Amino acid sequence: MEQTRGETRARRIEQSLIAVKGAGDLATGVIHRLARAGFPVVATELPEPTVVRRTVSFAEAVLLGEMTVEGITAQRASSTQEILELLSQGRVPVVVDPEGRLFRRLHPLALVEATLSKQNTGITIHDAPIVIALGPGYEAGRDVHAVVETNRGHNLGRVYYEGNAEPNTGIPGAIAGYTVERLLKAPVGGKLYGTRQIGDMVQAGDIIAHIHEAGCAGEPCSCQPTPIVAAIPGILRGLLRDGLTVKADMKVGDIDPRAAREHCFTISDKSRAIGGGVLEAILHLMQHL
């Protein structure tokens, strides 16, 4: 009986596996929704994830070994056997696989491009029976089977089976009336070191982090680190991990002016809406396979 159950579980995994490229906070919302709906999910990430909302990102499993977000646990895996074992345990394997070789080995039912790079990263409509992309950069019906809207507003989470998502405006969606003011960006390139923690209440003018320019980090020198300063009051909702190398003008953190600390440790409304769109797209497209 136990062997039969195991065989049934393995067959279900093989037939319904979803591969998600990316495991940042928005991708995590997608992964969480799919896992809760009963799909086995595997995610890929970079060796050094550049994730701002680390407390709600399965990408943290790359460095921590495992990461739990709202009852779903992701764990780093490095082989096909480990992936299958974790899936059989109801966990989400996270694999360092920037080249996407994993997808070709596992033959997933669906592939979700969730890096939100806002440009085509090489995913094609032929990579899986169902291919879905988040946000701009892909055309539904040509590059992928479906595109899910990621821009805050009336269409957030909408599924397009033809055409494109709304173009990238370069301006983040408004939260409590703030847009670009809530973002923390690196004024110069170098290594980032935080002075505050995710979940801290901050005020306008507070120093959130410093950038040590190349050649200065960790070495005695006369260089003065460049501060990153909060423009608005609120809760520090996200901040890159210490020691990461950043480029000038790169997003390194964000402040939530709603000042609700629990928002730092739960999946956002935006992530949930996008996750719902992906689930809808998969279930709809499965009917036409």
List where the protein language model places each region.
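Well-ordered secondary-structure scaffolds
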Residues: 2-289
